[in-house]
A protein has these predicted regions:
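Glycine-rich, Trp-frequent "lid" loop and neighboring beta-strands that shape
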Residues: 60-62, 103-148
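Conserved acidic
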Residues: 8, 12, 37
Length: 148
């Protein structure tokens, strides 16, 4: 499938490419070596407004999945961990957007978009590791909530 980049997509690509080269690449080796959470990279992504890329405008976003993919690609060229900060921030967005109530969407999506809330997810079980197809844990609806 071929996508034509809009002028906005190209502008975002150029900004992200420059930031990746000038600010992220010099830190990439240290981030990998220390195996610590790169708070400075999270702050950089937040300050640049990049967390907003895939979010609908009504939640403070730019509504551009293609620009989000471009950002991951550009950061991924120089530092997997920085690119992954975007992915981790966006995973709950999709889950909440697809299955969340209006209240949950209104409560969580703006904060995920502006970076004031942190995205997170978990997929590991002792018998399956991170193979989501092998996960056996289930949430069953019962009176008063769910049983895991």
């Amino acid at each position: 499938m071929h996508y034509e980049l809009s002028e906005d997509n190209k502008r975002i690509r150029d900004i992200v490419r420059r930031v990746a080269s000038e600010k992220v690449a010099p830190r990439a080796g240290e981030i990998d070596a220390k195996a610590e959470y790169p708070q400075d990279m999270f702050d950089l992504l937040k300050d640049l407004g990049l967390f907003t890329l895939p979010f609908d405008e009504k939640y403070g976003g730019m509504n551009s999945i293609l620009s989000a993919c471009i950002a991951i690609e550009e950061f991924g060229r120089v530092c997997y961990n920085t690119a992954y900060l975007l992915v981790v921030q966006w995973v709950p967005f999709g889950a909440i957007l697809a299955g969340g109530s209006k209240d949950q969407k209104d409560r969580y999506l703006p904060g995920l978009a502006d970076g004031s809330l942190r995205g997170a997810f978990s997929t590991t079980e002792s018998q399956s590791g991170s193979d989501v197809g092998g996960i056996t844990t289930r949430a069953v609806k019962v009176d008063g909530g769910y049983q895991i």
